[in-house]
Curated annotation (Swiss-Prot):
GO terms for molecular function: GTP binding; GTPase activity; translation release factor activity, codon nonspecific; translation release factor activity, codon specific. It holds the Pfam family EF-G_D2. Its main location: cytoplasm. This is Peptide chain release factor 3. GTP binds at residues 19-26, 87-91, 141-144. It comes from the Bacteria. Belongs to the TRAFAC class translation factor GTPase superfamily. Classic translation factor GTPase family. PrfC subfamily. GO terms for cellular component: cytosol. Gene3D superfamilies: P-loop containing nucleotide triphosphate hydrolases, Peptide chain release factor 3, domain III. The gene is prfC.
Amino acid sequence: MSTRLEREVARRRTFAIISHPDAGKTTLTEKLLLFGGAIQMAGAVKARKSGRHATSDWMAMERERGISVTTSVMQFPYGDHMVNLLDTPGHQDFSEDTYRVLTAVDSALVVIDVAKGVEAQTRKLMDVCRLRDTPVMTFINKLDRDGLPPLDVMADIEENLRIECVPLTWPIGMGSDFKGTYNLLKRELHLFSASHHGRIQEGILIRDLDDPLLDEHLGPQADALRMDLALLEEAGTPFSREKYLRGEQTPVFFGSAINNFGVRELLDNFVDLAPAPRPRPAITREVSPHEESFTGVVFKIQANMDKAHRDRMAFMRICSGTFTRGMKLRHHRVGKDVTVANATIFLAQDRSGVEEAFPGDIIGIPNHGTIKIGDTFTESKEELKFTGIPSFSPEHFRRVRLRNPLKAKQLQKGLEQLAEEGAVQLFRPQVNNDYILGAVGVLQFDVIISRLHDEYSVEAAYEPCSIHTARWLHCNDRKVFAEFCDYYSAELAIDAEGALAYLAPNPWRLESAMERYPAVEFRTTREIR
């Protein structure tokens, strides 16, 4: 291993921010970029008068609705480190894309609204983190508003997310009484000072709890802080980086992202504590980031990032070695060598060409329809296939109807390309020519209709269909499986990757099928091929 590769791996930090809608994730993303020097002014998402929009919300529909629909990838330097931040969809209807993003990162940052505590989507996303033992840091946001007591929020996190909480900062007051935070590691006080117009404005440091300045600034809250800290000292759990790296313990930070407060402390601790790129599992072996030979895996496809160019982009996580512009890579699924001359790194929609990139980095490579989610690329000819990138069973279904029959080819192309992105799943029933879309949440259907219109000039509509759920099928007994397929032929469909799925019309029909054919597996997830 070269000394330079070792150094570049050590300075990389690749993570995703996850939260329930409206917990302040997009605002925090903006402020991390602001402190990292990647942008000059935070574009407040809701500040319509200024005409600014959040850097990470670049699709037109996202700007209209104020939600993050796709996953943006942003890279910025911070001190000696290079940070790769994956801003994930915050709306509850966009969680399947978020699930897959969690396969491309080495750690996660969970954002919790202090007034609401743990919410449904956060629980689902933490389940995915737990499957991979992903280290998780927690930022409890909106301390400038009234909310739950800090101990109650942490108890809620421990109970619902099943992870031990250790505060590394502690809030003083809340809402209109919010005075700042105390850093338990550095033993210093950071007084709250609201920012204006997105500019960074630092607080005041007081290092000694016995300093009369503490009482001068906090008044009666000074004694309350001393009591809280004494309680934490006596009853709290000490922070263990080893437990954090194993996904057993989450360090907790408090702040107000919209006011820039607590963000620098969070970022400083993140680059110090979060892991550098880790080994990644493949079918045949584990791949170390320190291996000289390049490997990478595609975890996301985005169509038409620039409408003027009608382009499609494959997002690849570099797993080992060094990427250099113009290098020849083996595309294993199709068995061909490709020369990658124009890879890009993103700041949301702002692209810059890549001369070289290292493990942990996310690069975009142009995709003309040959690259799919889960594809592995290597510098060597070694047969390699990275694992752990799933599809999840949809919860909502719609039948697509075309308003203009002459646009049938455009509809098929649009649906196939959009399904390749992974936001929706496309099913073709075996008994007819219908297009059935399956999604984790209903808002995705609005996105598809909008993008078919804007990007493919196709006017389409939906009809309801009597499908309760989808299950991917597997059976080792060919005779039994053939009998099953014959009996349930009207309820079988092929997905976009050619996998056979059972579209159950109701829970009872699914239960009956499972009882009638116990040798058949009905799977809720499918490894992307």
